[in-house]
Amino acid sequence: MDLADIRQTIDGIDTTLLNSFVERMDIATEVAKSKIEMGKAVFDPARERSKLNNLAGRAPERYEAQTITLFRLVMSMSKAEQQRYINELKGITVSQKAHATAAASDTPFPQTATVACQGVEGAYSQIAACKLFDVPDIAFFETFEGVMRAVRDGFCEFGVLPIENSTAGSVNAVYDLLAQFDFHIVRSLRLKIDHNLLVKPGTKLADVCEVYSHGQAIAQCAGFIEGHGLHATKYPNTAMSAEMVANSERTDVAAIASRSCATLYGLEVLEPNIQDSDNNYTRFVVISREPRVYPGANRTSLMITTANEPGALYRVLERFYALNINLIKLESRPIPGRDFEFMFYFDLDCPFGSKALDDLLDSIDDVCESFTYFGSYTEVL
């Protein structure tokens, strides 16, 4: 057979496979109906293991692993279809709620709003807020939780919080608070962070013994701090540390903060750009008490808890793969009160309104204990 004949044969086999796959997926609804009548869950691990072992045993030895991979994927898509059908019977689905939210907020992202930020004037959260909103009315709070409470209580319409840094990693305190408060992420921003060593006028580097800043900033400037033998002390916020140094009677202290803090608090930039990496970015999220999906949303955030058993997280990841959804962030955090058990945060690169995302939202609960849809939004670069 020449290549043209081989390809023609492959086309015929692929047509047979496609027809069989469609037939297999169509019958998933009948399977769901039977499981409802019998009171059975969508996922039956014993049946699935038995089925996969049987199929692998019938396949040629050289194709056993590929057979398991193929049919595990088919079963995952079948379970997703079964769960989607069951959720539709229950009433409005998660994706339908999300689309209703988008329809209700079918306006551009607001240019002005009351915004809660952690810290004081000059904080990086303030800089982020001013890039996200043209005219933000900013209220400052000492802690991340204070920002959350301000939004929850209606004092501010939005909150701006740092959630991860390209050098120092995730801001775990914010992830933990997201699990406690019923909020929605409506936008995000990647902000380039350039840290500066700020001192009182006339202070020399040789005079500095102790440097104050937020823990994330200290981690991002670890090389500079260690290289100069400085003692680092954590402070609630970079701008607050600059304010503290300005008000201190000591002349042997410095702050790591933004350049704008030097002007605000009468300090000097002793050493500019002291971060370990020039490619230093912090990602900020905008939180809202009300669910909102603005036009152009192409990123989705979820929180998922799984059973504490082998393969539990794999089944979630398998569902993403089956629906061809790109996973761009996975973060695990301990579940309070449950030793050595974790919740998982996912960021997905998937346009809002796509069939893949709708199918995921309407079926993911069959492979996890619980999940929270934080929202779909645009990331500003």
Question: Which role does the model predict for each range below?
Answer:
Residues 1-381:
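Domain-level signature for soluble enzymes in the chorismate/prephenate branch of the shikimate pathway
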